[in-house]
Amino acid sequence: GWVLDLVEKVAPIGLDPCGHELAESSRRARACLFQGSSSHELILVAESENKDYHFHNDGLKTAWAPLLRGAVHNRQKAELVFVNPPYGRELKAWAAKMAAERDCAIIALVPARVDTAWWRELDPVAWCALAGRVKFLDSEGTEQDAAPFPSAVCLLHATQLLSKFVEVFQERGPVYVRVHE
């Protein structure tokens, strides 16, 4: 979809830690952790030359940086983690995980709930308040009704991607940049 097209203009997606085998983000990522249909285990798969990535992992418990191509040093990695977390009760845990993964460049699509504790914990470098409501796709690729809440795309930890993020997302809604460090 268009959100992923914009994300890929900022940087290539290296990892989708909470993907699904039918999700477009999981197909675009070099590697993803996805929930198997018969269990609650998550399986890492790679679509590139790294076909030996077949581990049972939990996206909330597995360190993300080692799964990206090459080493990550001082948050200068161009390849990023794209996170579209479950929007239910698990969202708080995913927000804490994203905040903790400080060695990864992360772009996340989340509900724009700026008044919540989990949002404050995210503390994005920048975020775009998307104009309108996002329409998600079902497993067949059919567009569903618009989300009943506003959405935001957040950039976390990756100050080196800030100018590109602003350039790409400013046409989709206002972009807010953190002024404290």
Regions found by a protein language model. Name each.
Residues 1-181:
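Class I S-adenosyl-L-methionine-dependent methyltransferase catalytic core
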